[in-house]
């Protein structure tokens, strides 16, 4: 993969208006060729998406998705600019796919990296700095490793950074940008909630061995009672038989 300089990224960003990470990826995918990188961004719909990113989104849809078996459920709100686009089948399909994506991603808690509180990032850094495999490494190397791990962890937590479940070569963010280019309006995921059946409920542990033993203990008295009943019945029958013999005499 070609080495991409900050100057190249800046130049492509100024030309297309795309984000820095998108520009860097475009250049990497095209071995630093500026013309091909611009075409790549246009094909992905990223340049037009960036131009529309500041426009207000007040319309849209709230979509629900229940996974097979009813054990996982999702509610997600995706906004667009007009009611006309909200009624378009392409927009509805996007919202359904985003809901399914959330259902398939148990680690996702935020929409994008900027939504993550500083306290969460600081806690992640504290955890990584304390790992045993970093103990003997110089501080400057340790810092780079920790930073890389934190960036990876942040991506795991963010919806927009997830590989799209139907095409692993595209992220959810890129999928949305493609739809923006197609429909000509700004589109944003505003909020979502993921439900898991029984989540947060402490389940009572069952001691099956003890349960079987208790059942066996309950059966014993019943067996004794049955034996006593049988003995009593036998004694009654014997007494009746003796009485009949006395009458015959």
Swiss-Prot record:
Main localisation: cytoplasm
Region called Disordered, residue ranges: 215-249
Any one cellular-component term (Gene Ontology): cytoplasm
Gene3D superfamilies: 1.10.286.20, DNA helicase RuvA subunit, C-terminal domain, Elongation factor Ts, dimerisation domain
PROSITE patterns in alphabetical order: EF_TS_1, EF_TS_2
Comp. bias regions, Low complexity: 222-236
Record keyword Cytoplasm present: yes
GO molecular function: translation elongation factor activity
Keyword Cytoplasm attached: yes
Pfam families xref list: EF_TS
UniProt keyword list: Cytoplasm, Elongation factor, Protein biosynthesis
Subcellular locations according to the entry: Cytoplasm
Function: Associates with the EF-Tu.GDP complex and induces the exchange of GDP to GTP. It remains bound to the aminoacyl-tRNA.EF-Tu.GTP complex up to the GTP hydrolysis stage on the ribosome.
Family statement: Belongs to the EF-Ts family.
Name of the protein described by the UniProt record: Elongation factor Ts
Species annotation: Rippkaea orientalis (strain PCC 8801 / RF-1) (Cyanothece sp. (strain PCC 8801))
């Amino acid at each position: 993969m070609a080495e991409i300089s900050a100057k190249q990224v800046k130049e492509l960003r100024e030309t297309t208006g795309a984000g820095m990470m998108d520009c860097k990826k475009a250049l990497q995918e095209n071995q630093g060729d500026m013309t091909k990188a611009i075409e790549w961004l246009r094909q992905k719909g990223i340049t037009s998406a960036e131009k529309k990113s500041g426009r207000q989104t007040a319309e849209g849809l709230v979509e629900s998705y229940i996974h097979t078996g009813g054990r996982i459920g999702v509610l997600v709100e995706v906004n667009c600019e007009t009611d006309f686009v909200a009624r378009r089948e392409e927009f509805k399909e996007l919202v359904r796919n985003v809901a399914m994506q959330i259902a398939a991603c148990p680690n996702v808690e935020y929409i994008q990296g900027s939504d993550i509180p500083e306290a969460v990032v600081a806690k992640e850094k504290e955890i990584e700095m304390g790992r045993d495999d970093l103990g003997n490494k110089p501080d400057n190397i340790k810092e780079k490793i920790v930073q890389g791990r934190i960036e990876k962890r942040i991506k795991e937590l963010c919806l927009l950074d997830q590989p799209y479940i139907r095409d692993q070569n595209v992220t959810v963010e890129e999928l949305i940008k493609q739809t923006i280019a197609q429909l000509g309006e700004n589109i944003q995921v505003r909020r979502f909630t993921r439900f898991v059946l029984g989540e947060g409920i402490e389940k009572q542990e069952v001691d099956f061995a003890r349960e079987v033993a208790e059942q066996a203990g309950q059966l014993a008295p019943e067996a004794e009672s049955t034996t006593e009943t049988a003995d009593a019945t036998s004694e009654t029958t014997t007494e009746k038989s003796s009485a009949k013999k006395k009458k015959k005499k």
